[in-house]
Amino acid sequence: DGVALAIYNIEKRGQSVVIGDQTGIGKGRQAAAMIRYGLLSGYLPIFFTDRYTLFSDMYRDCKALGIKEARPLVVNAGVSVVDFDHVVEQKATCTSDEIWSPADEEDNEKYEAERMALYQKQYEVVYKAPKKSVLQDILIKGELPQDAFDYLMITYSQLKDAKRDMTRLNFLMALCGQHRVLFIFDEAHKSSGVNAGKASVITQGINMILEETPQTQCVFLSA
């Protein structure tokens, strides 16, 4: 029902929708369904979430819905997407780029990095972020390499430095000008926040994109 209502709001009303089911009810599967809908309907889906280790959970849901071949651009440098159904033998530590996060990232960053390293060793890596230099080139150019990626995976933390470095925000803005974009905001409450009466940098950045590109569609998911 949540997916049907989201699609109805997009196609008939041009409006966003909030899917607010409780934890464990299946918001991830609904988010994957919206990625699938976007791919089949000519949108460029952009999946935002709170933690980059959740990219692998989203891949699991996409796989269950028959779109495991859809190729994500992982915007978080050094991060991999793994297949939990394929355990591999222990091997040497992955030589991926160091995982980048803004300087003011929360204390759980160390835990996330350790979990990602464990994922990379224990499970088959199906997708990973491009090398840092390649990724930076994509971001600066503000366009996706032709026929290389089908959707994006990114965390809210990538916009925390937007006041100092507009590269990622400008990249997203450019994509919204070039494509019909469908944002899927997982853990949407994590993107909001008010400090000293002002909206967070993340919220301001997302609002700026939506104001400048009114044709962009959104789905918000939050328990």
Task: State each model region's role.
Residues 22, 28, 50-52, 188, ...:
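An acidic- and aromatic-residue-enriched active-site/binding cleft used to recognize and process polar
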Residues 10, 39, 210-213:
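Conserved ATPase "switch" residues in P-loop NTPase domains
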Residues 14-34:
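Walker A/P-loop
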Residues 24, 189, 210-223:
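Conserved helicase ATPase motor motifs in RecA-like P-loop NTPase domains
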Residues 16-18, 151, 182-183, 218:
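Hydrophobic "anchor" residues on beta-strands that sit immediately upstream
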